[in-house]
């Protein structure tokens, strides 16, 4: 089915065979593996002294080659309206420190276009995080779609750039950066409203809280009372109200920390602080 100029999805604009080819390019086992090994999608990237500047493209080189060929052949055949664009609505980075808070150092994180030799931050979206501020969540929103093209011998696409500064005397890993995004590819492009880079400082997970509260005592007391045969000693399925421990109600209903991005975490964001635990 040839392209007819309507605003339809890419798979509708191309033939069924071409759609299958595109799916294979993006979601084959090899393509998924390359996204992990070359781009660190969803993986922890360690910032070390011998890796002070990290440039991670959002699309692997092999995938870029295949996408470029796919769109070019469709464009030359008159089936697609362009040679292809890459669209990334948002890039989210979770950053945690791996040294003590008194270590003097910082991270500079930004989104760049590999078509720019200087690798300047896109629209000034750049965040600097000092070691004592971590953990934190960072978000970037590109204001345009990136053409799938070659610039010299470089494949043009967006990239996450992380620069490590300071940390004198710390040769090992001082911070971990875990980036997530969802790249989209289409034969049409757009421009988007400019938004400043987001920076959210996150409360560290208090793993000592469960050991500092007498919740175990309250649970034991409730269990013993509920096992008494007389109904007048049966407790309803509610938290105990103890004068000796006024915060037991909160303790008994306390849930373990949720992982970032889980459905349970999103439902509970309205009443509990979000934490970064083990990113």
Swiss-Prot record:
Principal localisation:
host cell
The entry's protein name is Movement protein
Q: Which UniProt keywords apply?
A: Host cell junction, Transport, Viral movement protein
Q: Which family does it belong to?
A: Belongs to the cucumovirus movement protein family.
* Cellular component annotations (GO), alphabetically ordered: host cell plasmodesma
Organism placement in taxonomy: Viruses, Riboviria, Orthornavirae, Kitrinoviricota, Alsuviricetes
Job of this protein: Transports viral genome to neighboring plant cells directly through plasmosdesmata, without any budding. The movement protein allows efficient cell to cell propagation, by bypassing the host cell wall barrier. Acts by forming a tubular structure at the host plasmodesmata, enlarging it enough to allow free passage of virion capsids.
Q: Name one Pfam family in it.
A: 3A
**Coiled coil residues, start to end:** none
Its subcellular locations are: Host cell junction, Host plasmodesma
Which GO biological-process labels does this protein carry?
transport of virus in host, cell to cell
**InterPro entries to which the protein is assigned, alphabetical:** MPV
List the source organism: Cucumber mosaic virus (strain Kin)
Look up keyword Transport and say if it applies.
yes
């Amino acid at each position: 089915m040839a392209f007819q100029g309507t605003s339809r999805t890419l798979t509708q604009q191309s033939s069924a065979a071409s759609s299958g080819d595109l799916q294979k390019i993006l979601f084959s086992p090899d393509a998924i593996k390359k996204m992990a090994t070359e781009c660190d999608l969803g993986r922890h990237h360690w910032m070390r002294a011998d890796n002070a500047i990290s440039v991670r493209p959002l699309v692997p080189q092999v995938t870029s080659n295949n996408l470029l060929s796919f769109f070019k052949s469709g464009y030359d055949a008159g089936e697609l309206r362009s040679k292809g664009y890459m669209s990334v609505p948002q890039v989210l980075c979770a950053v945690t420190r791996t040294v003590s808070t008194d270590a003097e150092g910082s991270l500079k994180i930004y989104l760049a276009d590999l078509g720019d030799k200087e690798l300047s931050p896109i629209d000034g979206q750049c965040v600097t995080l000092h070691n004592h501020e971590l953990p934190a969540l960072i978000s970037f929103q590109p204001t345009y779609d990136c053409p799938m093209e070659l610039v010299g011998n470089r494949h043009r696409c967006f990239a996450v750039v992380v620069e490590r500064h300071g940390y004198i005397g710390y040769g090992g890993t001082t911070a971990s950066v875990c980036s997530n995004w969802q790249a989209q590819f289409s034969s049409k492009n757009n421009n988007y409203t400019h938004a400043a880079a987001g920076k959210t400082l996150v409360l560290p997970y208090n793993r000592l809280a469960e050991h500092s509260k007498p919740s175990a005592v309250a649970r034991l007391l409730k269990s013993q009372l509920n096992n008494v045969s007389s109904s007048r000693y049966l407790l309803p399925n509610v938290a105990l109200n103890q004068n000796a421990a006024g915060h037991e109600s909160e303790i008994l209903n306390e849930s373990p920390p949720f992982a970032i991005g889980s459905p349970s975490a999103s439902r509970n964001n309205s009443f509990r602080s979000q934490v970064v635990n083990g990113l």
